[in-house]
């Protein structure tokens, strides 16, 4: 029995066979109006079947939400196991990033990955970066507080639950001191989109409305810019 479903818009990636065919006129380019119509149809059909949207591109029956993806969208931690796997862990202590979150990428080649786990290989140098990681990890990216705030806005605002206004706070613990430029610009952006019926800012949370889902990327971009990130 299906308890969740996903529907993503088609993105034509550079360097693909489809991109070349679109460029030559052999295939039509994705059309935003067509996408909106199809999204409407999918949303209506899923709602009739007892599904609710919990992320812009994801629907589920009660209790059927994908917990794995929610960890990503809520800035949680996970460990990537296997060649080419990605992870994100929180580390504390001297030399670690402000947020403590570090993204990890394992070696793609299986032989290199297993060699790294055995204590050798190219990933061994990562351990000299002050991080207690296995040699299978070949890339790390430390997330600053601003990086984390940007991701929180980008990902959590796409959730039906939205995000708490306090999650827009910076390292000072507030979304901008009263009267500050950041606070004023953010308030103006929120007011504009709530006036258009695209955002719901009631209570202590900021949420996309059903109509706002279609313009989620633009709304998120404007909020991030207003925060100076």
Short names for language-model regions:
Residues 4-172, 179-180, 228:
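C-terminal scaffold of the Radical SAM
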Residues 179-195:
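Short amphipathic alpha-helical interaction segments
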Residues 211-229:
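Short, amphipathic alpha-helical interaction segments positioned at domain boundaries
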Residues 194-204:
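A short, conserved structural fragment
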Residues 123, 136, 188-191, 217, ...:
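Auxiliary N-terminal substrate/complex-recognition segments of SAM-dependent methyltransferases
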């Amino acid at each position: 029995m299906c308890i969740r479903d996903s529907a993503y818009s088609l993105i034509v990636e550079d360097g693909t066979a489809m991109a070349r065919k679109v460029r030559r006129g052999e295939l039509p380019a994705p059309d935003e109006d067509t996408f909106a119509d199809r999204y409407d149809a999918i949303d209506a059909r899923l709602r009739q079947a007892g599904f609710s949207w919990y992320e812009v591109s994801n629907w589920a029956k009660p209790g059927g939400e994908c917990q794995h993806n929610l960890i990503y969208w809520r800035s949680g931690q996970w460990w990537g196991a296997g060649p080419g796997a990605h992870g994100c862990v929180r580390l504390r202590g001297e030399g670690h990033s402000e947020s403590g979150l570090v993204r990890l990428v394992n070696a793609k080649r299986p032989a290199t990955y297993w060699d790294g786990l055995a204590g050798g290989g190219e990933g061994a140098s990562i351990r000299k970066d002050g991080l207690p990681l296995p040699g299978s990890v070949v890339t790390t990216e430390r997330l600053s507080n601003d990086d984390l705030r940007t991701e929180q806005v980008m990902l959590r605002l796409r959730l039906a639950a939205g995000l708490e206004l306090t999650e827009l706070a910076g390292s000072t613990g507030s979304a901008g001191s009263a009267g500050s430029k950041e606070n004023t610009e953010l308030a103006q952006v929120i007011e504009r989109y709530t006036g258009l019926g695209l955002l719901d800012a009631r209570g202590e949370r900021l949420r996309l409305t059903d109509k706002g889902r279609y313009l989620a990327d633009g709304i998120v971009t404007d909020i991030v810019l207003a925060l100076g990130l």
